[in-house]
Amino acid sequence: MTDQPNASQQDDYTQYASTQEEILQAVRENSVRRGLFFLKNLSALDVDGIVQDIEQLGREYDMELWRERAEEAGISPAALDTLDAHDPPVPYPYYFCLPGDLVREPRLVLYYRNVAMISNKVMNNIGLDTTQHEISMPLGVDKAQSIAQHLNKITSALVMETGLYGQRRHLEMVYVNIGASLDGGWRNEVGRLAYVSVISPIVLHLHRLQKLKSIIFKVKGRIVLEDEDENDNGKIQEVELQGRSEQEVATLLSDLEDQRIVYRQINLTNGNSVLLNRQMYWHNEETKRRYRIGPDLITEIPSDTFPWAAELKGGADPAGSDEHWKTATQAFNRMIDAAEKTHRPIPQLSFMATILVDRVAQEAALWLQQGKLASVHNLTKIANDPAMQQDFLNQMVAFFEMTLDETGNST
């Protein structure tokens, strides 16, 4: 961290620093969003319905048939003995599956994969992808056999090693593993929601001003089933918004947010584009070297020049505020270095965050005074103040529309 600011700097930074109540507000709002994310996914996956199907199997299964087919399905007879030894005995379908049941009802794969406490990502990596079958895509006999054997061998070991004491332990295993998957998805969702909270209002504002041409995006879908960073196969789409009514645009954005939109680009009527969450390289033609940058937002004008860029940090945990600032300043410094070494104009820079603790607000204010930053935005403060919201939208429009003068300076 830098030296402590002087008295005048102290006065400046307080307008950006989050109060204790603002931090509590941000944490509450983040907790609600996280809870809704988990609950919506559990509902969409129909976990309760799948569990009811498993319990029905447990009431109807033929113990002798299961014993006959156990080894070919990858089930250890010793594991079945362990379930029989419980008082009362535990039904075999609570932990193990037969291939025929998976063919009949592919959604059961979700249950048995989670009982085995293995992730979709790992299943995909070993050539036994289950993702689409878990939302009812038909499953062939051979693949069902391979999946059943793999999962049953894992669960057999878990049963024999632990005894799995407790009549509801199978449900605990399912929900713990689903929770772990959703938690990983939530960590990615925090950043996506930060983009949406900033970009959607700007898109509407640009449209009202008749300065918006189109948006480019992809959607992740309503359900999180796998590691989305590793399986980022969403189709890129472009929608022309120029000429549409305000209600049409608002309805479209609401529908896209429900499908978990990922904004990629905003195209303005003046020819500028704002690129979002991009990795790009700037080249020095003389040295043949290239420099990688990855701004969260960056304005591109038609001459392949970039007059403005920003870092956007979601998340409400005050313990992470310092790290967010550190990550942002590293990104800023990479952009400055890349611009200097490729003989480009240095972009004006902005920092946006859900909260700013005092230390971060002090440093951000110092960067402003030193001319390193063009603006700093505390998104929770902005959300609480209509006047600040309007000022923020107007500033963003100015940054999005920015051009360069004859000297190469941003205007």
Segment roles from a protein language model:
Residues 122-290:
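The feature marks a conserved, polyanion-engaging helical scaffold used by nucleic-acid processing enzymes
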Residues 32, 44, 59, 85, ...:
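Generic surface-pattern signal
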Residues 216-411:
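Catalytic core segments in nucleotide and nucleic-acid processing enzymes
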Residues 76, 209-212, 345:
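Short coil/loop linkers at secondary-structure junctions
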Residues 1-201:
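Nuclease-adjacent, charged terminal/linker segments that flank catalytic cores
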